[in-house]
Amino acid sequence: MENDIMNIMNDIKYGYLDLNGNIHYVIDEDFDSKYKLQSPNETLNNKVGVCWDQVELERYLFDKKNIKFNTYFIVYYSDNICPTHTFLIYKIDNDYYWFEHSWEKYRGIRKYSSENSALNDIKEKFINDELSNNYDDTNLFIFKYSKPRYGINLLEFYHHCENGEKVK
């Protein structure tokens, strides 16, 4: 079942659709001002999305299959950049799984004994890969967030996620 979802996700490339309908395959200087969150159908049709868009498509697909899941936003607040990642963790029986498509290095499905152990592993990978272990733990947060409104911009997406439940 989850492999069917991954097969659908494998058609999606990393990048974003800007406000003018242009596709960008790299995060460029226009991202902050021109990004808009796509709906799952837009992501499917455009075959492009950053992690934020891809998780919304995953949300839609997991929901259709009635698989219990949560979505998370990890962010590191610093003066010049604020790296983020969104991801989905689902539960089947007593096991938890990290479903990852957009972060290519970790693409796949990983099994954990608890949701907390999954969150700790993802946090460690984010610190190692995105922050090069050079960070202040008081600036790193993970929020569990609900389905956002599609079409919102970057700051609106940040605010939506930050209004979720702070879990780490």
Say what each PLM segment does:
Residues M1-K168:
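A structural boundary/capping signal
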